[in-house]
């Protein structure tokens, strides 16, 4: 058999052995060569091509794509069978010694036409070679790897010697119980064995013919393909008929042999693809003796199981016909049971391992379940699952019968062996964890849920839920898992959030006062090192800490190094909050109002840079916000000019003056109008900014708003001025009860914040009318007003802060002796200078609206 298999090696599928240490081969799950060879020598037969047990991974070369010369050596680009172009590797010629035919074919093609791409000449083996490939592949690969691993070859030869005719007879007698749970007649098994030998001889003849024509022409290749297909169909048809005849004969002789041979059957696919080793036979015989009693109790169930088997067999054979050219391999493990595995493609191999892992867990759960419950479900489920599996890959359709075969063996085994096998499986799974694609996981879960009882489903759901906690990208497998997954995700999110804040709270004890800064403390207790990172990261602090930070009440830093004034100034200029914090919390005294050559203070530097944290810190430490440069610029003007809205808000809250003018007469409101920032404009005018102040060039804020073509800012200012005029006139009419008629204003209404100082002054031009009507004159009104957003409330009664009014160096007299809101006013034609002395009230919120009107008594 070994010689025939060797001669039948096809030029269409060559096996190449690649050591783990060379280059980049397609991914494998192999382990060290030395350890695996030692394991193979001591534990029994090891099938060639098993990527888990062999020291080397065995891959099939599909074709050679390209060749290049590098470092004086020829490298060949190899396409591996079952892999995509992404897994192509460059291999030296020495690695292709076992694939000389492929190499010669490539060289021949290269000589014929170098410009053309290498055509795919290597064809896969037909199903003729697949039926008993578990036998032939072992011999074929043993000869291929003769020089590399002699010990493995000896093991394989020993395995073949052990498979004696007596063993085959035992195995075939078990196959008879495939459908009816009883041992078949010796004649039936002999016929099956004889049929198998004839079938193998026919396959060997086909292989010999294929070997004689290893390099056929295109026409010969087509004829060979047609011949293979015809032989394949004929063999499958004959095999199906033969098995059905054996089933009928077994059914007739079942009752006669019942008392003499009550033995347990094995998997339904033994006659097709599975061969057991000697250890398997011993354990199975024990198993059969122990189950004699249970077999007698199950006679009533056999007719149902026979029908299930026939249906299952039809499905399997129909899948065999559609399978195409696929390679089936046998895998033996150093344990008392056999688990078949096909090595053809790495992804499909991993998927099969994962699908095998679930039945291993299930074995331990099946202890309390009757054989009737287990045997009624698998067969139809297998057929349905196998068909759906073929849609995602060709390999799956052949793996599923193996899986069915393996599970039927395990279900019929005594309960005493479940725990031992579960322990062995658990140990091996701990050593080798397969990588599985998500699509295979979905198929596996759907596959298993059909076979499990309600109690088992609950156990599997718990295990799957644990996996879903680890993998956030897992998909919902079925409706039963959805609720568990949602609840677990909610718990996990709540736990993560709680842990995050708990970690922050715990870390707060290690931080050096300010939650914005983190300190890195070494494990050996060395001096804490300041982490000069980004400030104001809210993930680092709780809400209470952030509020303390805003209020400047966070704990001080402790430092022993003195920071000089020039470095403090540079830190403010560069926005280094930590350095400023350390300096201001030290014992060193700093002049926070220090000025440079232009009069720029630290507050101005922070405002001009938009450093809100530094600005709050400096204000908290007592820095003045209304300092002026030599050109009259203030911190508020800097912030408005640089368009920093939050900085403007901080300064206004700290009491910054809004009507301060630069040397060119411009105010913060004018700067905001130039920038076109309506938010800053609204914020400033609601705080009492004077919209009618004129610059050095006699331009008002309204002029700058119009100049920047910002309609929103212009309308905002115009609306505010109209509101002030309307409120002033209404207040006058209400106060004088229509005894006084307003003719025209003498100058636009001015606004002065009492907190900005006790003195108010303004210049205006007055042009008296040519004809002054009798009973008319000019009065000065000083309203006390409050701004409530866009609303303005004014009064001419109550407490008054006006002490004196001076016009052109002449005191003006109040109209009412007990009230200083209304003064007689005598301007001259031309320029006039008005000065008003007020009560000093630096914290007053009241605004003064100052306006003069020409009035007529009625």
Curated annotation (Swiss-Prot):
Residues 273-282 have a biased composition (Acidic residues). The record marks 59 as: Interaction with histone H3K9me3. Residues 80-87 are annotated as: Histone H3K9me3 binding. Residues 59-118 form the Chromo domain. SUPFAM superfamilies: Ankyrin repeat, Chromo domain-like. GO terms for molecular function: chromatin binding; histone H3K9me2/3 reader activity. Transmembrane segments: none annotated. The gene is Mphosph8. One of its GO terms (biological process) is constitutive heterochromatin formation. This is M-phase phosphoprotein 8. It comes from the Eukaryota. One of its GO terms (cellular component) is cytosol. Residues 18-55, 129-175, 209-234, 250-300, 321-431 are annotated as: Disordered. Heterochromatin component that specifically recognizes and binds methylated 'Lys-9' of histone H3 (H3K9me) and promotes recruitment of proteins that mediate epigenetic repression. Mediates recruitment of the HUSH complex to H3K9me3 sites: the HUSH complex is recruited to genomic loci rich in H3K9me3 and is required to maintain transcriptional silencing by promoting recruitment of SETDB1, a histone methyltransferase that mediates further deposition of H3K9me3, as well as MORC2. The modification Phosphoserine is found at residues 51, 85, 136, 138, 149, 164, 188, 267, 271, 278, 318, 392, 400. The chromo domain mediates interaction with methylated 'Lys-9' of histone H3 (H3K9me), with the highest affinity for the trimethylated form (H3K9me3). The modification Phosphothreonine is found at residues 144, 385, 453. Residues 159-169, 283-300, 335-357, 407-431 have a biased composition (Basic and acidic residues). Expressed in the spermatogonia, spermatocytes and granular cells within the cerebellum. It is found in: Nucleus; Chromosome. ANK repeats lie at residues 598-627, 631-660, 664-693, 697-726. Keywords: ANK repeat, Chromosome, Nucleus, Phosphoprotein, Repeat, Transcription, Transcription regulation.
